[in-house]
Amino acid sequence: MTMFASLTSKMLSVSTSDHASVVSLNLFVALLCACIVIGHLLEENRWMNESITALLIGLGTGVVILLISRGKNSHLLVFSEDLFFIYLLPPIIFNAGFQVKKKQFFRNFVTIMAFGAIGTVVSCTIISLGAIQFFKKLDIGTFDLGDFLAIGAIFAATDSVCTLQVLNQDETPLLYSLVFGEGVVNDATSVVLFNAIQSFDLTHLNHEAAFQFLGNFFYLFLLSTGLGVATGLISAYVIKKLYFGRHSTDREVALMMLMAYLSYMLAELFALSGILTVFFCGIVMSHYTWHNVTESSRITTKHAFATLSFLAETFIFLYVGMDALDIEKWRFVSDSPGTSVAVSSILMGLVMLGRAAFVFPLSFLSNLAKKHQSEKISIKQQVVIWWAGLMRGAVSMALAYNKFTRSGHTELRGNAIMITSTITVCLFSTMVFGMLTKPLIRYLMPHQKATTSTTSMLSDDSTPKSIHIPLLDGEQLDSFELPGSHQDVPRPNSLRGFLMRPTRTVHYYWRQFDDAFMRPVFGGRGFVPFVPGSPTERSSHDLSKP
């Protein structure tokens, strides 16, 4: 009888727990719907955008739950870095690579890598040195060198979503490409830096250890990129050879989604950078795999990946907003609010300083290497790039939770101060800087119609957005050139030609290699699956008529 009563009580507790989870999920889905509807209604608002809308709805919901629970709880779900890195981040980064306008991205690849990789290291260094200088005077806890370096990596991670939602990539292709590309590379670099700092022995620092650290850093970068490219090529080869669309387009779509996610999980399995891997997997898939599937599969995958990315971004901002009022973490700093405000202010100042320390110098160096005025970064564009990287978001939150909590909970005062300061910086930068983004960009970058050649180069109504343009310039390079450039791409037959036109030289040899070796094996642009009853068959039949 006692055993039966014990079993019954356990079943009731499980049932109650399941019911609470169902209620939480239902409310969260309803909040997501509200974010989409309200964000759409406020789309033309001067100050608001979808990210800020989701954040405010999350904060408001947290306040309501806090009042209902009488100060005991403020969120439906506890922020988990595992949930963020495993389920929410992959679709966002993959879609970024899948939809990227590759011509602009690779045209500015060196500048993007300089901003995203070198700039992140510079920003991390300045934030770490500033934290060492100021935090020891505030007596917030005992932090070692590894902790300070981790703080630098945490706050070097930017979140440029608010700026990208305002910029128009057809009107300002150069600026959009730089902000977008830097954001992806910055996230990857920050995570790689953070993981390297966590796993590296910092007790014995010398020149050999420093070179080993740099070697590991570049090793992760190159291997992660290679894994993403390899996974994308495998998916292209399999779909090209097996003609899944002959039997079912569902299999094509399913395989593309699973291969994309597999690339990220393989990177995590081998302790590489999943962000870089899935990003380059997306680029390769859009260049080869996407062209190997049927027309219906192309439309489906384009919208499916974009929808998953949009939902994940909205979920993250809603999630962060609700978790910002977590009572457990704020209780530790309730006795010294001045210290918490001081830490947050110092971090925000260091973020702004670290950002300026590389954006303007690297832009100056980039302009020295550019020949045409249209390719140079103007001072107004530099200000927008600097501003776009001031906001901090879910990556910083996830890294902070990983470093300063255990299973989402913290027991040390210093760790609690760092968590609450991270939340404060993320909320302040996203809401204040995010609300000022639209007016700032409208002031600095008045709406100007792109030139005819640029617009035609970057968009095509007959094909899905951003996927029309082939990798590293395709066959259309000759007919779509920026004003002031040569109409065709001559064969670079000398070292002087490479030094004078390095970008075009790389494009030329890439096109030769792609056409001769890659496309015959992996398909891509020009490969059209012949599926009975499909639009492909009908168009082919129409073309065959006299």
UniProtKB/Swiss-Prot annotation:
The chain crosses the membrane at residues 22-42, 48-68, 112-132, 219-239, 265-285, 305-325, 345-365, 382-402, 416-436. It is a multi-pass membrane protein. Its main location: membrane. Induction: Induced by abscisic acid (ABA), and by NaCl and sorbitol in a ABA-dependent manner. Glycans are attached at residue 292. Residues 43-47, 133-148, 195-218, 286-304, 366-381, 437-546 are vacuolar. It catalyses: Na(+)(in) + H(+)(out) = Na(+)(out) + H(+)(in); K(+)(in) + H(+)(out) = K(+)(out) + H(+)(in). GO terms for cellular component: cytosol; vacuolar membrane. InterPro entries: Cation/H_exchanger_CPA1, Cation/H_exchanger_TM, NaH_exchanger. It comes from the Eukaryota. Residues 76-96, 149-168, 174-194 dip into the membrane without crossing it. GO terms for biological process: potassium ion homeostasis; potassium ion import across plasma membrane; regulation of pH; regulation of stomatal closure. It is found in: Vacuole membrane. Residues 1-21, 69-75, 97-111, 240-264, 326-344, 403-415 are cytoplasmic. Expressed in roots and shoots. PANTHER family: SODIUM/HYDROGEN EXCHANGER (PTHR10110), SODIUM_HYDROGEN EXCHANGER 2 (PTHR10110:SF117). Belongs to the monovalent cation:proton antiporter 1 (CPA1) transporter (TC 2.A.36) family. Acts in low affinity electroneutral exchange of protons for cations such as Na(+) or K(+) across membranes. May also exchange Li(+) and Cs(+) with a lower affinity. Involved in vacuolar ion compartmentalization necessary for cell volume regulation and cytoplasmic Na(+) detoxification. This is Sodium/hydrogen exchanger 2. It comes from Arabidopsis thaliana (Mouse-ear cress).
